[in-house]
Amino acid sequence: MKFLILNAGSSSQKSCLYELTGDRLPETIPEPLWEAFIDWTVLANQGRLTVETAGQKQVIILETGDRQQGIARMLDTLVTGDDAVLKSLAEIDLVGHRVVHGGTDHAEATLITPEVQQAIADLIPLAPAHNPAHLEGIEAISALLVLGEVPQIAVFDTAFHRTIPTPAAEYPIPQAWTNLGIRRYGFHGTSHKYCAQKTAEILGKPLADLKLITCHIGNGASLTAIKNGVSIDTTMGFTPLEGLMMGARSGSIDPAILLFLQETQGLTPAEINTTLNKKSGLLGVSGLSADLRTILQAKAEGNEQAQLAYVMYIHRFRSCLGQMIASLEGLDTLVFTAGVGENAATVRADVCQAFEFLGLKLDPELNNRSPRDTVISHSDSLVTVLIVHTEEDWAIAQDCWHWWHSQGQRKQS
């Protein structure tokens, strides 16, 4: 079976092709036959496509800013050129999509029907940076005649957080508002779930025995408290804007600020939304960049706003982590993942320093090496700290495999 995975971001498209054989999933993560990444931010009205097969890498400039055309060109590299891995796109058995927001109706991998596609569209106001990109991928696949009848499966970021108890999931607002679907949905669920399971595997312990917090820290960032193997609290909420200070997102702020800006500055909801999601966080405070590496470099050069941005970033990270520890009523395992979480030793050290009173003790040498899928806490630490490399694409492929074996084969017969 060949599964194509599309993982769309607000300004990128990451894709890979897995070949899975037999009646069981492999014990180790297989190397994809093909990987591709489109970056829409590098060139104006163009995209930069990077394709890798069997260790060979090629870069293609897409002479279009049209996402569907770009995805079609990306898929063309599967079957054309010296590094083609398929004779025809018809060899693809299933296409899996990461979808950020699934609302209250989707708790597992779901066959994308017109009704599901419309539901994803209806949730665009709650995930304006992501759900449109997911729809572009779905529509691009549907537009290809050779793939038009191939099952497309949605794997929702929100699904893992369906287990959050009502007191943590609902907001202290009138019930009439709650009845509108206003609640904590949580995001990065595919990553949090994968990293939790991988942590249990690394430690050789049942996941249900761990009081675990997973820290998915990239340009977007969230923490999740996991107890008895399920999510019981998370920092993102109704939208991916709540919680931690992020690269360009503000994270949690006093909602009265928005009313103040509307009343005194005449800002529209759209203007406020854009500012909070794309012009705040590290970028907004520093005035320089949403990239933590740039902030750290500027901080080292004495830039005061970069220094302030970093200190705020760490302060809010610590505060949110304390909140998750309280929800767990303790902590025995802490996991860092994603771009910043896996690579920024300084962030890990500065965050963990505040929790030494819990007996948490990093091993400085291990932490500075940023090893993958490894414990980085000291041997006498009361809290085990790990770096786990998140594998969202493989996690999506696993969910698609389970769907295929539980439902897909019946639908094909």
From Swiss-Prot:
GO terms for molecular function: acetate kinase activity; ATP binding; magnesium ion binding. Pfam families: Acetate_kinase. Gene3D superfamilies: 3.30.420.40. One of its GO terms (biological process) is acetate metabolic process. It catalyses: acetate + ATP = acetyl phosphate + ADP. Mg(2+). Can also accept Mn(2+). It is found in: Cytoplasm. GO terms for cellular component: cytoplasm. Substrate binds at R98. Its main location: cytoplasm. Pathway: Metabolic intermediate biosynthesis; acetyl-CoA biosynthesis; acetyl-CoA from acetate: step 1/2. Keywords: ATP-binding, Cytoplasm, Kinase, Magnesium, Metal-binding, Nucleotide-binding, Transferase. It is an enzyme of class 2 (transferase). Its EC number is 2.7.2.1. The active site is at D157. Signal peptide: none annotated. The record marks H188, R249 as: Transition state stabilizer. ATP binds at K14, H216, I217, G218, N219, G220, D291, L292, R293, G339, V340, G341, E342, N343. InterPro entries: Ac/propionate_kinase, Aliphatic_acid_kin_short-chain, Aliphatic_acid_kinase_CS, ATPase_NBD. Catalyzes the formation of acetyl phosphate from acetate and ATP. Can also catalyze the reverse reaction. Homodimer. NCBIfam families: ackA. Belongs to the acetokinase family. This is Acetate kinase. It comes from Synechocystis sp. (strain ATCC 27184 / PCC 6803 / Kazusa). The gene is ackA.
